Amino acid sequence: MSLVPVVVEQTNRGERSYDIYSRLLKDRIIMLSDQVNDVTASLIVAQLLFLEAEDPDKDIFLYINSPGGSITSGMAIYDTMQYIKPDVSTICIGMAASMGAFLLAAGAKGKRFALPNSEIMIHQPLGGFQGQATDIGIHADRILKIKQNLNSILSEKTGQPLEVIQRDTERDNFMDANQAKDYGLIDEVMVKKK
């Protein structure tokens, strides 16, 4: 039994059925509604590239309801968002935590939104290592570089000084939509679609 709804449309050739995500893609809407991992990142990157090829001048809308996930997978999405020509508008529905919040903030300036009851959470990268001391040291250095890079990007995207980002991501930092707007993670709390 499929849990993905199907939409039936009338065309001049009869009826055509789509899964709901394919139908939304026709309207340039991409959904990130799961953990950020290699599979979700590949799907989102492919959709971003497809929509750019379809029309490089029309905005793309990325709806986010995600607890976060893999940094490398998230950075693949982030880099693609910055690389493609169309503006990517981000909209938080529900929760954007960790890498989900990072991607929310990475939307085109002026086009980053959250619905009124959304929750946004930022924090530092998580990592757990085991093995030889030398290997643990290598991984610790790597995660510190990643933390520095993520904080630097968040500082640029939010307009917050780097020191503020470093302090505020030291622990889980939860915000409602209005607090996220004041912080610079989003540009507007959207009550009704314009």
Swiss-Prot record:
Q: What keywords are annotated for this sequence in UniProt?
A: Cytoplasm, Hydrolase, Protease, Serine protease
Name under which the protein is recorded: ATP-dependent Clp protease proteolytic subunit
Name the NCBIfam families for this protein. clpP, PRK00277.1, PRK12553.1
Asked if the keyword Cytoplasm belongs to this entry, the reply reads yes
Q: Name one GO biological process term.
A: protein quality control for misfolded or incompletely synthesized proteins
Write out the function statement from the record: Cleaves peptides in various proteins in a process that requires ATP hydrolysis. Has a chymotrypsin-like activity. Plays a major role in the degradation of misfolded proteins.
Which cysteines bridge via disulfide bonds? none
- An example Gene Ontology molecular-function term: ATPase binding
